[in-house]
Amino acid sequence: MPNTNVFTGMDGSITIAVDDAESPEGQAATAVSDGFGLAPIGRATDVSVSVTSAMRPFHEIGQRYATELRPGNVNVEGTMGRAHINGALLRLMLGDAAAGTRPAGAFVSPTFNLSLLLENPAKPGQRSTLTVHGVKIDGWSYQMPEDDFVLESVSFKGLWIGVEDASGDAG
């Protein structure tokens, strides 16, 4: 049954998981997740995920309006901010290349799934989970303002996205 609840960010949690722990990309993500205790990802803020589909209109000669819309490539991307407490997000982007020494050559970029779980504590079992699969972080920034929290932010891309609703007990 589809979820009909509304949520706030207070109802959310963010976790990462690895689909293929045997691949070099999965091993790199597992090492960062285990080493930095990223289950769940704490102190996150301003999370956004967007999905776009390239839509191509077909125009016939003699017609001003499109006759048909043809779907094209689908892109999944997003951003996330976090109060900076360690180098976990930078390591999720660069893997061992962020370990403090310059890598000698090419290096593996970690790949992981990012799950956003929303569950209202007043209605246990009723939740929505959005999972972005095959995530790679493609941008990282660090802000150190004079009189505010030090924040880091990342942008990411994913291969595909899925959503799952759980209705819990009806009564």
Q: What label would you give each PLM region?
A:
Residues D46, T52-R64:
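Structured soluble/peripheral alpha/beta segments that form catalytic or ligand/cofactor-binding pockets
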